[in-house]
UniProtKB/Swiss-Prot annotation:
PROSITE patterns given in the database record: RIBOSOMAL_L15
Similarity field: Belongs to the universal ribosomal protein uL15 family.
Record-level GO cellular component terms: cytosolic large ribosomal subunit; preribosome
Protein name, entry field: Large ribosomal subunit protein uL15A
Organism whose genome encodes this protein: Schizosaccharomyces pombe (strain 972 / ATCC 24843)
Gene Ontology biological process terms in this record: cytoplasmic translation
Keyword flag Glycoprotein: no
Record function comment: Component of the ribosome, a large ribonucleoprotein complex responsible for the synthesis of proteins in the cell. The small ribosomal subunit (SSU) binds messenger RNAs (mRNAs) and translates the encoded message by selecting cognate aminoacyl-transfer RNA (tRNA) molecules. The large subunit (LSU) contains the ribosomal catalytic site termed the peptidyl transferase center (PTC), which catalyzes the formation of peptide bonds, thereby polymerizing the amino acids delivered by tRNAs into a polypeptide chain.
SUPFAM superfamilies hit by this protein: Ribosomal proteins L15p and L18e
Statement: the UniProt record of this protein carries the keyword Cytoplasm: yes
Gene: rpl2802
């Protein structure tokens, strides 16, 4: 490439060669990284990163999740946790596949033994179960699975 058209040759005689008078092509003129986000780079941060600075809401220091949380459901309401189609499919029919009722997904933590179950095997997944409820489920041919 001929030297008489290169940029450095063109800029001979112009003191700062296109790099300005004060900074003179030195160091990090805007600061390093995200420096200046609240000062000289504020318009960029406001436009492209809204909500980057500041706090929102309150922090609850001593918040304890309830260790005794266990809403209960009785055996007589157990089959209502299944959708209608599944209930019609399994109740009263002699199938080899048993329905799985996950009590935790329905918002309950413990199964209690009030009421009667139909004589259809069922797999109950729960976190806690009473002794009578477990006996009645096993009498109906079902199984209780304890899940975390």
């Amino acid at each position: 490439m001929p030297t008489h058209v290169s940029k450095t040759r063109k800029l001979r005689g112009h003191v700062s060669a296109g790099h300005g008078r004060i900074g003179k092509h030195r160091k990090h003129p805007g600061g390093r990284g995200k420096a200046g986000g609240l000062q000289h780079l504020r318009s960029h941060f406001d436009k492209y990163h809204p909500g980057y600075f500041g706090k929102v809401g309150m922090r609850r220091f001593h918040l304890m999740k309830n260790p005794l949380w266990r809403p209960t459901v009785n055996l007589d309401r157990l089959w209502t946790l299944l959708p209608n189609e599944a209930r019609d499919k399994y109740l009263g029919k002699n199938t080899e596949v048993a329905p799985v009722i996950n009590v935790l997904q329905s918002g309950y933590g413990k199964v209690l033994g009030k009421g009667r179950l139909p004589e259809t095997p069922v797999i109950v997944q729960t976190r806690y179960v009473s002794r009578r409820a477990e006996e009645k489920i096993k009498q109906a041919g079902g199984v209780v699975e304890l899940i975390a």
